[in-house]
């Protein structure tokens, strides 16, 4: 989980971000604005933090025997070594691209959760990353804004809710390869 999620509910902050989102109303009107931020540079400590969390979670299972605990610890250590090696082989741009894709996976899960609760959400890329990073003071935190997800309930007078959604037909979107 080489990303961080900021949750903005403050209207003044949303108003500032609205201007840097090409005046798209969902940014200003949402109840919660989730901003998924990827690290600009991955460091060993980020992986170590996750490994520590994994180890703590696995130690909570007191019913395992000693051998199982040793095997589990070895697997966790191996996972950490592999993760560090995988990130280490990538150049900075490739690592950033990979971390940004992790944000999109998380956004999709939040969208599914929102839909399950009948809360509207709308993923956004249309914003100035540089401006968001400055407004949210992300520069000193080794983070950069990657993708936005405003969530909330639409108003009854939302004129877009009745417009026909335009999507590619299934037969043009999916192609079976044998």
List the model feature ranges, each with a label.
Residues 1-178:
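Acidic, surface-exposed loops and disordered segments
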